[in-house]
């Protein structure tokens, strides 16, 4: 079952990215290092609802 998620920056809390994930393969929250245009650096982005 694939669901839509948003990824929020852990430093400035802005929601920068939208993505989809398979809940069966990844039941826990996703965390990815991505570029944040507000922080102007690569930071960790966590899955939000």
UniProtKB/Swiss-Prot annotation:
Top-level division of the source organism's lineage? Bacteria
Matching entries from Gene3D superfamilies are given as: Ribosomal protein L33 (2.20.28.120)
Species of the source: Desulfitobacterium hafniense (strain Y51)
Query: What would be one Pfam family of this protein?
Result: Ribosomal_L33
Which gene name does the record give?
rpmG
Keywords tagged on the record: Ribonucleoprotein, Ribosomal protein
- This chain's protein is named Large ribosomal subunit protein bL33
Q: Which GO terms describe its cellular component?
A: cytoplasm; ribonucleoprotein complex; ribosome
Task: Return one Gene Ontology term, BP aspect.
Answer: translation
Q: What InterPro entries does the record tag this protein with?
A: Ribosomal_bL33 (IPR001705), Ribosomal_bL33_CS (IPR018264), Ribosomal_bL33_sf (IPR038584), Ribosomal_zn-bd (IPR011332)
Keyword check for Ribosomal protein, yes or no: yes
Similarity annotation? Belongs to the bacterial ribosomal protein bL33 family.
| Gene Ontology MF, one | structural constituent of ribosome
């Amino acid at each position: 079952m694939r669901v839509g998620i948003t990824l929020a920056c852990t430093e400035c809390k802005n929601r920068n990215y939208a993505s989809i994930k398979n809940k069966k393969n990844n039941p826990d929250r996703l965390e990815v290092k991505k570029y944040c245009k507000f922080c102007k650096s690569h930071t960790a982005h966590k899955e939000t609802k």
